[in-house]
Each structure stands twice: as C-alpha cells, then as structure tokens.
C-alpha cells in the first residue's frame, strides 16, 4: 500500500482530541482493569460495522459463519497448541477449568475433533466472530497504548480443513481473502513471510498482514495466516477417509484473522483523520456505519 496517501493530519489515535469519550479506558480500568475499554456511541457502532463487513465479505468468499462457544475445555486448547505452550497467557476459570478463548481458532478447529469428514467436502471453510481474551503478560511501552494491545478485543477468524496435497495453495487463498478486506478498507498494508524463528512450534508456514498507522508511523499486525499441516489434526484426531487408500488420513488445518478489530480501527482513525478532527469512513464501510464521518465531539 501507499503509505504516503494517508492523511497529512494523522496523529496517534490515542492522541486525537475526544478519543477518550468514545474509547473509555478509564472507566474500563475501574470496572475490570487495564486493557478492557468501553466503546461508547459511534465507537461501538463502528465496531459493529466492521464485524458485519468482515463477516459479509467472508461469506462472499465461501466461508460458512459459525457462532462458537467462547469458553473451551483443556482438551480443546491442547488440540490447537494453546496448552501447554500458552497456558500463562489465557484466562482460566475455576473450579471448572474452562479457558476464555484467545481466538476463535480454538473452538472452530475443535468442531470436527474425533471425527472423520468426507474427503469430497474438502476444503471446508468456516468463519467466526468472537471476543478474544489474552493476558498479554510482559507487554509494555508504546505497544500497549490505546487500541494497540488489549486484554479483550473483537476478531473474526477464518479457518479451513483441507486435503494435505493442497494445503499450501489453500493458505495462499486464505491470505488473499484477508488481504481483500484491507484493500476494500483502503488501508496501506504489507505482507510478511515469517522466518522459522518467528513460527510457533505448531506452525509450518505463516504470513503476517500489517497495516500502516500513519499517526504512530508504524506497522500494526492485524492478521496472521498459518498452515499447521497435520499438527492440530493429529492432536484433535480430525481425519478424512482417502478414496485412494480407503484408510483415514489426517487433514491439514489453516487459519487466519479476518480481521482483528482494534488495530484496524486505529489505522482507520489515524490514516483518515481530517483537519476538523473528524475521521472519514472508508466507502465500503459507510453502508454498515450509516455515516461518512466519525466525530469525537
């Protein structure tokens, strides 16, 4: 994307006059703690607009929408690789030992746990919106200011169960589906192919999508698109019966954010800030938001 095309009036979203009226971090901190803001008035409306836009575009791309549980058991979190690797980053309930989902990837992937799916149905494509909950222990500095890093945030997830022979082609298609959202929102972005040192132990290949935040003058990650090959499927025992051999074989699982809302919001605010303090809403979002501008006063 062309980062020079952003507003000449861009400032960091958290420094925009009136930001705290629509994104109330102080009251959120009082009620829950740091990183749990209230979205008030048109801020809440804009979140709802983004989620509706994401889900509608994902449906056009062939993903079937699912509304999943937002708490999962230890078996589900183990199947996707959150346990034991990220146990300290998740919110856990007692005495039931259920975990608040850090991403819809966890309940969605487990949809077919301990099942054999029809090979003819592959690839199976699903999308889901959930609030996501992450402790983010150890985060500090500019990375946590404003909407950059929250303990609770909204995200739409894309997920595919695919035949092993096509999993890398399907990963590229999934990445393009996420890119399509950024293009329609007219946000400058870049695609990073992550090196082995930046992969989780469960991932075989990962792309990160980052948007340019013109006020902060930095790139913000809004999506990671990953191929897990058979790692999650082996833990979850998700298989298909091969027509060629007649035996059950493991599927490959892929997922990616489509997209994470807070940083997309931050980029829209910063890149589209006008001289009068209003924010111009991307044209694709206007039918969902109902207005052409977001005002902070």
Please identify what each model-predicted range represents.
Residues 2-297:
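TRNA-recognition modules of translation machinery and tRNA-sensing kinases, especially anticodon-binding
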């Amino acid at each position: 994307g062309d980062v020079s095309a952003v507003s000449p009036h861009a400032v960091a979203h958290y420094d925009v006059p009136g930001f705290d009226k629509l994104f109330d971090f102080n009251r959120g901190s009082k009620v829950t703690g740091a990183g749990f803001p209230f979205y008030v008035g048109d801020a809440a409306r804009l979140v709802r607009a983004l989620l509706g836009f994401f889900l509608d575009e994902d449906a056009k791309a062939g993903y079937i929408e699912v509304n999943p549980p937002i708490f999962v058991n230890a078996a589900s979190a183990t199947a996707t690789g959150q346990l034991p690797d990220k146990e300290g980053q998740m919110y856990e309930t007692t005495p039931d030992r259920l975990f608040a989902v850090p991403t819809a990837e966890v309940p969605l992937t487990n949809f077919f746990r301990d099942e054999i799916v029809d090979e003819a149905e592959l690839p199976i494509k699903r999308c889901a919106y959930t609030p996501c909950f992450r402790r983010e222990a150890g985060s500090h500095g500019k990375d946590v200011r404003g909407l950059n890093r929250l303990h609770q945030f909204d995200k739409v997830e894309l997920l595919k169960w695919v035949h092993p022979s096509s999993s890398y082609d399907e990963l590229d298609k999934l990445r393009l589906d996420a890119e399509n959202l950024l293009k329609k929102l007219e946000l400058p972005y870049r695609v990073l192919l992550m090196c082995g040192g930046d992969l989780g132990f469960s991932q075989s290949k990962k792309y990160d999508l980052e948007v340019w935040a013109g006020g902060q003058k930095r790139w913000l990650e809004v999506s990671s698109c990953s191929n897990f090959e058979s790692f999650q499927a082996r833990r979850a025992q998700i298989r298909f019966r091969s027509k060629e051999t007649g035996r059950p074989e493991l599927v490959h699982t892929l997922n990616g954010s489509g997209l994470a809302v807070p940083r997309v919001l931050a980029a829209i605010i910063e890149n589209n800030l006008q001289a009068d303090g209003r924010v111009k809403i991307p044209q694709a979002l206007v039918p969902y938001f109902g207005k052409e501008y977001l005002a902070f006063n």
